[in-house]
A protein has these predicted regions:
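Conserved active-site alpha-helix within GNAT-family acetyltransferase domains
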Residues: 102-115, 212, 235-253
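Conserved acetyl-CoA-binding loop-helix of GNAT-fold acetyltransferases
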Residues: 79-89, 201, 207-223, 241-246
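…primarily DNA-binding HTH/wHTH and HhH modules…
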Residues: 240-242, 246-286
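Conserved donor-binding loop and adjoining core beta-sheet/short helix segment
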Residues: 2, 6-11, 22-88, 182-197
Length: 286
């Protein structure tokens, strides 16, 4: 396997699960999404790169998921190491970056970066969890159309039934209509961690604690199988942060998400054409 060397980092593509998992476990709560992808159903489409210091110790990791749109790009560890990986090993053209502000600064010469969206990574374990009771019901593949209608994803861009079959989703119905739901982004029982996501309540039915009910139900079921549950929430969404805190979630770290476009090559010159052809993408609710 080809290895690139710079004055500060030695980088290479990696596929050994134990090597990847060992590094991710150094901050497993920050790496919750990546740990989910490590053994997830889409793992064949996930590429990994790592950087090492002069002694051969790993210093940074980058994960690129080719199976989603936009393609997630997760950065962890030394910013200069992440930059070296993206310069020599993993070179996605367009991606949705998740990392820290320092990571963004380190790769700014390689990628054109959109304005950052600041997120809080909140986490809970069994000891801290404070469940919130309510009429939340487990959703199944039979509820796929109702869930897509709530998320307004439509039939072309909506979730397939497998999302509800493989994940854990709960919802609240009012007079038969699904008005609130929450589910999972990733579950890794082997690593003992899961990620809650896609929390949404219809605008006409907010103010009734429905989001807290469905999030509580999903979290409770997850904690029966894993030690830690994580989620992301917009840092400026104070009501949501407070609601999750009442369930026992605490803030583990702050991170940023943003679209990133490779600067080099003809791809960048084609940006106006790509933008004109781009299918609108609605960010998942958080």
């Amino acid at each position: 396997m080809a290895v690139a060397t710079s004055t500060r980092s030695r980088v290479r593509a990696v596929s050994d699960r134990n090597e990847i998992a060992t590094f991710l476990r150094t901050d497993r709560l920050y790496a919750a999404y990546a740990l989910g992808d490590l053994d997830g159903p889409g793992r064949a489409r996930v590429a990994w790169g790592m950087s090492y210091d002069e002694t051969g110790s790993p210093t940074a990791l980058v994960m690129h998921h080719e199976g989603l749109v936009p393609q997630p790009l997760f950065l962890m560890g030394a910013p200069h190491g992440c930059r070296a990986i993206l310069e020599h090993v993993l070179k996605p053209r367009d991606a949705y970056l998740q990392g820290t502000e320092l990571h963004g600064e380190a790769i700014a010469d390689l990628y054109e970066l959109d304005a950052p969206v600041t997120m809080l990574r909140m986490v809970v374990d069994r000891a801290a969890f404070a469940p919130f009771a309510g009429p939340a019901e487990r959703l199944t593949a039979l509820d796929t159309d109702d869930l897509n209608r709530l998320y307004q994803l439509g039939f072309r861009g909506g979730f397939p039934p497998s999302v509800l079959e493989e994940g854990i989703y709960y919802g609240v119905r009012v007079r038969g209509r699904l008005v609130s739901a929450a589910g999972t982004h990733a579950i890794n029982r082997r690593e003992g961690i899961a990620v809650v996501g896609n929390v949404m309540t219809h605008a006409d039915f907010r103010g009734h604690d429905f989001a807290k009910m469905v999030t509580s139900a999903v979290t409770a079921e997850l904690l029966a199988h894993v030690a830690d549950v994580a989620l992301n929430v917009h840092a400026d969404n104070e009501p949501a942060v407070a609601a999750y805190a009442r369930l026992g979630y605490r803030t583990h770290c702050e991170l940023v998400e943003r679209l990133a476009r490779r600067r080099s090559g003809g791809w960048g010159l084609m940006r106006p054409i790509r933008e004109a052809m781009r299918i609108p993408w609605q960010r998942e609710p958080k």
